Amino acid sequence: TKSVVASQLIPINTALTPAMMKAKEVSPKGIPAEEMSKIVGMQVNRAVNLDETLMPDMVKTYQ
């Protein structure tokens, strides 16, 4: 299964948009790609580098 990764540098406290994310096969696994639409609009609590996997603890209010 694919996970959500950053398709660009995402600064701290930025609200996520679809253009900032892509689905990719990675290890360890992060937020599942099928939840990408669910996290749109949520803010990251730290800077996320290009191609870095989004983990649940990086996204504010992610359940």
From Swiss-Prot:
Residues the record marks as site: Important for ice-binding: 8, 13, 17, 43
Location in or out of the cell: Secreted
Family annotation (InterPro entries): AFP_Neu5c_C, AFP_Neu5c_C_sf, Antifreeze_III, SAF
GO CC entries: extracellular region
SUPFAM superfamilies the UniProt entry points to: AFP III-like domain
Keywords: Antifreeze protein, Secreted
Record keyword Transmembrane present: no
Tissues expressing the protein: Detected in blood serum (at protein level).
Domain AFP-like: 3-62
PROSITE patterns (UniProt xref): AFP_LIKE
Role description: Contributes to protect fish blood from freezing at subzero sea water temperatures. Lowers the blood freezing point. Binds to nascent ice crystals and prevents further growth.
Protein family per UniProt: Belongs to the type-III AFP family.
Protein name, as recorded: Ice-structuring protein AB1
